[in-house]
Amino acid sequence: MAIANNKKAFHDFFIEDRIEAGLVLEGWEVKAIRAARVQLKESYIYWKKDAFYLVGCHITALPTASTHIKPDAVRPRKLLLKQSEINKLIGKTERAGYTIVPLDLHFSRGKIKMEIGLAKGKKQHDKRQSMKEADWKREKQRLIKHTR
């Protein structure tokens, strides 16, 4: 079950590979995510020393959050990946044009997981072509529905 999707990632990038990663979260963040108070739109992932971090993901604290904790809505959050996955991602992102983007946030066996994608940026004409294909697909479904 998806909690939040990053639709902009599918519009701006060709997604070539997908990997599921865990997140290091605080208690108030878990409560806020369960209440779907999270936004992935402007978030991205970068490599720093020994791990990948999610930056720009906005998690709005619940109004009932503890008074002695100062919630930081956009703090960097560490991603939990296997060493083989880390090596694979580092190897592919070192090639020109590849980046890692967050695709969605979901539950997996009661844990909050993030699906990340190895992506290559789309040019403007690629975006237009994708929009034309989506319009044609929608029109085709409409025609099939009306001919029945």
Curated annotation (Swiss-Prot):
CDD domains: SmpB. PANTHER family: SSRA-BINDING PROTEIN, TMRNA-BINDING COMPONENT OF TRANS-TRANSLATION TAGGING COMPLEX. This is SsrA-binding protein. Pfam families: SmpB (PF01668). It comes from the Bacteria. Belongs to the SmpB family. Residues 119-148 are annotated as: Disordered. Residues 127-142 have a biased composition (Basic and acidic residues). Required for rescue of stalled ribosomes mediated by trans-translation. Binds to transfer-messenger RNA (tmRNA), required for stable association of tmRNA with ribosomes. tmRNA and SmpB together mimic tRNA shape, replacing the anticodon stem-loop with SmpB. tmRNA is encoded by the ssrA gene; the 2 termini fold to resemble tRNA(Ala) and it encodes a 'tag peptide', a short internal open reading frame. During trans-translation Ala-aminoacylated tmRNA acts like a tRNA, entering the A-site of stalled ribosomes, displacing the stalled mRNA. It is found in: Cytoplasm. Its main location: cytoplasm. GO terms for biological process: trans-translation. InterPro entries: SmpB, SsrA-bd_prot, SsrA-bd_prot_CS. It comes from Neisseria gonorrhoeae (strain ATCC 700825 / FA 1090). Keywords: Cytoplasm, RNA-binding. One of its GO terms (cellular component) is cytosol. The gene is smpB. GO terms for molecular function: RNA binding.
